[in-house]
A protein has these predicted regions:
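Amphipathic, Lys/Arg-enriched alpha-helical "gate/interface" segment within cytosolic domains
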Residues: 2-106
Length: 106
């Protein structure tokens, strides 16, 4: 797992051999500061739908605190009608995050 702090968000990359429990602990630690999160799970070779759904609780918490919680997933079948934001590339995720920040500031 790789964690990078950017200007208005934290980017977490989950690699295929990383334990999912470590990621959940990492996310829980971020819930204290409530930074915007972009989590890249496109390198996972497991059932991505199940993995995405496991983040629903976290995404809801972030949304309540007016922060972004975005997953980068390279699976076009995943669409959750904004319950949880899933985008295919990091560039799209960053762009979406900045749009959400603009909306929150208006």
């Amino acid at each position: 797992m790789k964690v990078e702090k950017k200007d208005i968000y934290t980017h977490i990359i989950l690699y295929n051999n990383d334990p999912k429990d470590d990621l959940k602990k990492q996310i829980d630690s971020f819930s204290i500061d409530m930074d915007n999160l972009i989590i890249d799970i496109k390198n996972q070779n497991i059932n991505k739908v199940q993995l995405v759904l496991s983040f629903l609780k976290h995404a809801t918490l972030w949304k309540k605190k007016n922060k972004s919680f975005i997953l980068v997933v390279n699976d076009s079948k995943i669409d959750y009608d904004k319950e949880i934001i899933c985008l295919p590339t990091l560039d799209e995720a960053v762009e979406y995050l900045y749009m959400e920040e603009l909306e929150r500031n208006v």
